[in-house]
Amino acid sequence: MSDTDYLTRAEAVLAAVERSVDAANDGDADVDLERNGSVLTLTFENGSKIIVNLQPPMKEVWIAAKAGGFHYRFVDGAWRDTRSGDEFFAALTGFATQQAGMPIAFSA
């Protein structure tokens, strides 16, 4: 994947996360979202955080959550965990739901 393709796809991930947080906040969720360059920080009511950031040199998107640190690469049309193969948005949904104590869904 070229650098341009990576940036286009990775920025789309960040935009989708932002849209998903907005949708969750339209419901019962209370998630604070802060963007600083290519880093998104999601802060939940209980003070826990999830950080999503881009890693251009490695062409990856990373998640840091209570469950640990996870690296995702674009493979066969989806961002996949480099160890487990889990899809990015499904994994982020699980991490956020666990940390928020309520269902919070993320999608592309």
From Swiss-Prot:
Any one cellular-component term (Gene Ontology): cytosol
HAMAP family: CyaY
Name assigned to this protein: Iron-sulfur cluster assembly protein CyaY
Entry keyword Iron: yes
InterPro entries the UniProt entry points to: CyaY, Frataxin/CyaY, Frataxin/CyaY_sf, Frataxin_CS
Taxonomic superkingdom: Bacteria
Record's keyword terms, sorted: Iron, Metal-binding
Disulfide bonds: none
GO terms for biological process, alphabetical: iron-sulfur cluster assembly
Molecular function in Gene Ontology: ferric iron binding; ferrous iron binding
CDD domains: Frataxin
